[in-house]
A protein has these predicted regions:
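Periplasmic/cell-envelope proteins involved in peptidoglycan metabolism and beta-lactam response
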Residues: 1-315, 419-426, 539, 559, ...
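Intrinsically disordered, low-complexity charged/polar segments
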Residues: 502-506, 629-636
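Beta-lactam-recognizing serine transpeptidase/beta-lactamase-like catalytic domain environment
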Residues: 78, 84, 125, 224-234, ...
């Protein structure tokens, strides 16, 4: 049985002590309250103002404007336009009943908002005290100006009732922001790319240069000073820098016109996977071989930059909308990717000029050497055929290029050897990024001296067995025909601030000289023979000396790793004028939608059409005569041949100052730093100075 706990009792002495402590605490509290009351009466206003002066009022962000993207002539490809968000302070409207209807009517009439929904929003229990309700986004400057004009009409023009109505519009204010606009819609879409409302760049220049295009937001602060007066402090935004690209919208439009024409011409083929298109990919690059500047770059996967998630031109939009996010990402990536820089494939015979250049430069062959083609070569018991299985017979080096002879190239490769072949692949920058200022550049894949054997060497000589991108090939080919100088291809000429001042100029970058001018001269002659008499005849342009090379590559089935019977990438790369090239055009057609993909000369003809328009546009004169019979052979009328044509004897148009008016820049200012070719570099040194694909930042510019 538990004992009962006795109640604890304080003795009288302890009770007196507790009472004393309680009395003391009570006295202190009374004194503190009296002190607070005294301070409040005597100095309350002073301290209230000090508190108010430390409190922030009416603080807002002032958004920066993202920089523009222009072509080389100042045509705007991307820009940011100021827009406004309509904000409503419901609490301010509810201060008086008289404010409700005038405010609702002003919003409804000026911005097309529903009056019933507005009344409900303003008076609803959960929003009536809200001071921040977004009513409408992306309101234009014109809409905002019209609203402000409607509530600032002079009293002289209004009745008393209308004045009261106007003065009772309360709680409406605006926040500034910017939206990205693309005035030329889909033009150069895979190059320009797009950005979202948060100024995050997606693909293209918008992505690569996003840190340069972006600026820094400003801020406006409002404070009450000690006199309870509102003072404002404004930190202005720093707008983003703008890009002056190397693109020429006129050349870009010409290129895209003929891509579209070919896409439509072949669209009736039987390949249902192409969704009514003429080929899986059709792509063209136009470059200045003397500077590395890209005049045009386009594919048949263009899309409206203002509506990039609309992929209905290639896919069933309803089916895409039903996919998971991961599956949609695959579709969008396929649509937005740039075939010219991100897709690596076997080049085929367009690589042959590089093999011959290397053999000539190393002395492995001489320009006057001859080779006998019997239609095939046996390489370690493996028979490798020439395209002409009956053989071309005896050929010179130039004729081997003209005839696109695999047999002769294998013999040349044997003389060159594995070590030198691999070295010159690297010297021409295959297997490495070119450093072009676009994201997601593919480096392709090469054999090394360790894993390349006789068969691999033989097939590599004519562009089979390794992969390359279009940008790698056109940069290398430009070096073959321009005297031997390898320039880094680039997309941006200048970076400018929002006042138009130049922040940075991207001068041409000469990386190396893999071959001599004398070797380049031999290749110029061989490539011209290929257009006049060989496989590139369909690329002939009346009045101009054109040199070029065709290419046909059987694709690899990614599932089996074997040759994909009947599926080809066909191409043509050409320079004009071939004796002193000002422009190089590279056209690729991936799986044309026809029964026999190797026939038809589609890229050759497309290249010819492009050159026929851009050569006169670039003020490059026609120097060669031609006959009606020659025109008829290629299905060209004399009117087409002479449209826009200029000759060396014609006087160019000049301005009032006597300066020649040029419709496009075919040259850039002389750069004393690149007038002489650099000394030959080691393999490691060749990679130095080649930027990675991370993109340039504002900090990079500030550090220069």
């Amino acid at each position: 049985m538990k004992k009962r706990r006795r109640k604890q009792k304080f003795d009288k002495q302890m009770q007196k002590k507790l009472l004393g402590v309680f009395a003391f605490v009570l006295l202190v509290l009374v004194i503190l309250n009296l002190k607070i009351a005294y301070i409040n009466i005597k100095s309350g206003d002073k301290y209230a103002k000090q508190v108010l002066s430390q409190k922030e009022y009416d603080s807002r962000t002032i958004p920066y404007r993202r920089g523009e993207i222009q072509d080389r002539n100042g045509n705007v490809l991307a820009r940011s336009e100021k827009v406004y968000t309509v904000i409503l302070d419901c609490k301010a409207v509810n201060e008086k009943e008289a404010y409700l209807e005038p405010t609702v009517q002003a919003l409804a009439s000026s911005f097309g908002l529903d009056a019933v929904k507005l009344r409900s929003l303003i008076t609803a229990e959960d929003t009536k005290n809200s001071q921040y309700q977004v009513l409408k986004k992306k309101v234009t400057q014109e809409e905002k100006d019209a609203y402000e004009a409607s509530i600032s009409t002079s009293d002289e023009n209004l009745t008393k009732e209308e004045i009261n109505q106007r003065n009772n519009v309360k709680g409406i204010w605006f926040e500034e922001s910017y939206v990205r606009e693309y005035p030329m819609k889909s033009l150069a879409s895979t190059v320009v790319g797009f950005s979202n409302d948060l100024s995050d760049g997606f693909v293209g220049l918008e992505s690569y240069y996003t840190d340069v295009l972006n600026g820094v937001n400003g801020r406006e602060f409002g404070y009450l000073n000690e006199d309870s007066e509102l003072q404002r402090t404004v930190i202005e935004p720093e707008n983003g820098y703008s890009l002056v690209s190397t693109l020429d919208v006129n050349i870009q439009q010409i290129v895209e016109k003929y891509i579209k024409q070919l896409d439509e011409e072949l669209s009736d083929g039987s390949n249902q996977e192409l969704n009514g298109h003429g080929a899986k990919n059709i792509a063209v690059i136009v470059i200045n071989p003397k500077t590395g500047e890209i005049y045009a770059m386009a594919t048949n996967h263009g899309y409206d930059l203002s509506d990039p998630y609309n992929v209905s031109s290639w896919y069933d939009q309803d089916e895409v909308d039903a996919l998971s996010e991961e599956e949609q990402a695959v579709v969008y990536n396929d649509m937005w990717s740039n075939f010219c820089v991100s897709y690596a494939f076997e080049l085929g015979s367009t690589f042959k000029p590089i093999t011959v250049s290397a053999a000539l430069e190393t002395g492995s062959i001489n320009p006057d050497d001859t080779f006998y083609c019997d239609g095939y070569e046996f390489i370690t018991d493996t028979r490798i055929n020439c395209d002409n299985i009956n053989g071309h017979g005896m050929e010179t080096v130039r004729e081997a290029i003209q005839n696109s002879c695999n047999d002769a190239l294998m013999q040349i490769g044997y003389r060159l050897g594995v070590e030198k072949f691999c070295k010159y692949q690297r010297l021409f920058n295959f297997g490495s990024r070119t450093g072009i200022d676009l994201p997601n550049e593919n480096i392709g894949s090469l054999y090394t001296t360790e894993n390349m054997h006789e068969v691999e060497l033989a097939t590599n000589t004519f562009g089979q067995g390794f992969t390359s991108t279009m940008i790698q090939e056109i940069a290398a080919f430009s070096a073959v025909v321009n005297g031997g100088y390898y320039y880094q291809p680039h997309m941006v000429k200048q970076i400018i601030n929002d006042q138009g001042g130049v922040v940075k100029t991207n001068d041409p970058i000469l990386l190396r000289q893999p071959i001599s001018e004398s070797t380049s001269k031999v290749l110029q002659e061989a490539l011209e023979m290929g257009v006049l008499y060989g496989t590139g005849k369909k690329a002939w342009v009346p009045g101009y000396r054109i040199g070029g090379k065709t290419g046909t590559a059987e694709k690899i089935n990614p599932e089996t790793g074997q040759r994909w019977s009947g599926r080809y990438i066909v191409s043509f790369i050409g320079a004009a004028p071939i004796d002193d090239p000002e422009v190089v055009v590279y056209s690729v057609v991936d799986e044309p939608n026809v029964e026999d993909q190797t026939q038809g000369g589609y890229p050759h003809i497309m290249s010819r059409k492009i050159l026929m328009e851009i050569l006169p546009y670039l003020n490059i004169p026609a120097t060669e005569e031609y006959t009606d019979e020659e025109l008829a052979e290629y299905g060209i009328t004399r009117e087409e041949a002479e449209a826009g044509r200029i000759t060396e004897t014609e006087t160019p148009e000049t301005d009032e100052n006597g300066n020649v008016i040029q419709s496009a820049d075919s040259q850039v200012a002389d750069n004393p730093n690149i007038s002489n070719p650099p000394a030959e570099k080691t393999d490691e040194e060749q990679q130095e100075g080649l930027p990675d694909n991370a993109g340039i930042t504002r900090e990079d510019l500030a550090a220069e």
